[in-house]
């Protein structure tokens, strides 16, 4: 689930307050069942909390809110992603320089 965690935390951070599981599932391309499973896992890890809408006619309606832990996790995952991409870029730059050096000889 670690690969999906960043995707989910990012989507939940940007989701409208009234987004339900079906809406989130459609937006991310997952089944509603998998969406429910992942949301429960994120709640269990403390990255997310589900709050009932007080003024909602639908008493089963929840909004999903990132916790401070969830936001920290999202930041750490984003930093790791950026670092990984920098390393890939630098490796490509070195490879390009090697190819240029071989070609110019």
For the regions a language model picked out, list residue spans one by one.
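Alpha-helical residues within the helix-turn-helix
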Residues: 26, 44
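Short, cationic-aromatic polyanion-contact patches
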Residues: 1-7, 20, 53-74
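Amphipathic alpha-helical dimerization/coiled-coil segments
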Residues: 73-105
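Key DNA-contact positions within bacterial/archaeal DNA-binding proteins
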Residues: 33
């Amino acid at each position: 689930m670690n690969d999906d965690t960043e995707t989910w935390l990012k989507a939940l951070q940007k989701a409208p307050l009234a987004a339900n599981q079906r809406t989130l599932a459609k937006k991310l391309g997952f089944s509603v069942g998998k969406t429910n499973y992942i949301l429960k896992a994120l709640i269990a890890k403390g990255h997310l909390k589900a709050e009932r809408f007080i003024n909602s006619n639908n008493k089963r309606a929840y909004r999903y809110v990132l916790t401070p832990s969830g936001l920290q996790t999202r930041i750490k995952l984003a930093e790791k992603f950026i670092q990984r991409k920098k390393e890939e870029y630098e490796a490509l730059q070195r490879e390009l320089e090697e190819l240029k050096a071989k070609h110019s000889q």
